[in-house]
Amino acid sequence: SRLHTEGILTPILLGTPTEIKEAATKSGWSVNGIETIDPNNYDQMEDMVSLMVELRKGKMDEASCRAALQKSNYFGTMLVKMGKADCLLGGATYSTADTVRPALQLIKTKPGSKIVSSCFILYRQSENGTEMYAMADCAINLDPSE
C-alpha cells in the first residue's frame, strides 16, 4: 500500500473481489485505485490457456493448464509471461519451490543460463527504528560460489 502510494510500484492483486476486500480490511490497507484481477472471471483466460498449453506442450494438456491457472502462482506467472505484469511476488503465500517452479516452466531462464537465484527483504522494528535485511540465494542457490 505504501509503495503504491509513493509511486514506486503499481500492484495487481489476484483474487475474488470479496477475498481482496476482506484481506485489505483485515490488514488496514486501502485498495482504492489498485488493479484487481479475479482469475475466475478473467477476460483473457482463453488466450492464457492457449499460450500455457503451447509452452507446456507434451507436459500439460488444456484441462491441467486450466486447473493450474486457478492457483495464483501459475496465473501470476502467466501475467508476467504475457507482458501484463512486470514481476510476481508470491513467497508469502507459496514456498520458494512453488513460486519458482511456474517461472522456470513458463518464463524459463535466459538461453545458456542454468542457474537461478532469489532474494527477499526482511523488515524488523527495533529500538533504532526499522532495520532492513536483504537475503540472497537462501532457498535456491545454497552455495553460490560453486
Segments predicted by a language model, with ranges:
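Anion-binding alpha/beta catalytic cores of soluble intermediary-metabolism enzymes, centered on
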Residues: 1-146
